[in-house]
A protein has these predicted regions:
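A long amphipathic alpha-helix within ATP-dependent nucleotide-binding catalytic cores
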Residues: 25-82
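Short, solvent-exposed loop/turn segments at secondary-structure junctions
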Residues: 1-6, 11-16, 71, 76-83, ...
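C-terminal active-site "lid" helix and adjoining low-complexity regulatory extension at the edge
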Residues: 81-115
Length: 115
């Protein structure tokens, strides 16, 4: 949100028809109440280790997101190295059924569009 990371969305153990997911706050506390889990998006373990490069990744995400009202920054940590994936401006075409309506409403309140 204009260069301010608000949460970390973790995807792991990706398979052909599913990927485990969990949302964390910036202090690395899991928030399963933010997600709608399903067969396609099952709950990841609540004790996913904090990435060793999380502070660097959050700084990188903030720098890349600066100036954009909302953007998802995909970063990956593999073997202690950080990799950039993509910047997405309309995650899942805006139809993110894997988040609760309450979470989406709160996220939407953080978006400030230029007039």
């Amino acid at each position: 949100f204009d260069g301010r990371p608000e949460c970390v969305y973790v995807t792991m153990n990706r398979k052909k028809d599913s990927v485990e997911v969990m949302t964390y706050d910036l202090d690395w506390v899991a928030h399963p109440e933010y997600s709608v889990f399903s067969d396609h998006y099952p709950c990841a373990s609540l004790d996913v280790p904090r990435p060793e490069n999380l502070d660097f990744m959050l700084k990188m995400a903030a720098d890349l997101a600066e100036g954009f009202p909302q953007v998802r920054i995909d970063l990956y940590e593999v073997g202690g190295k950080v990799y950039f994936g993509e910047m997405t401006f309309t995650s899942n075409a805006g139809m993110m059924s894997y988040f609760t309506p309450e979470f989406l409403l709160e996220a939407g309140k953080k978006v400030t569009l230029p007039l």
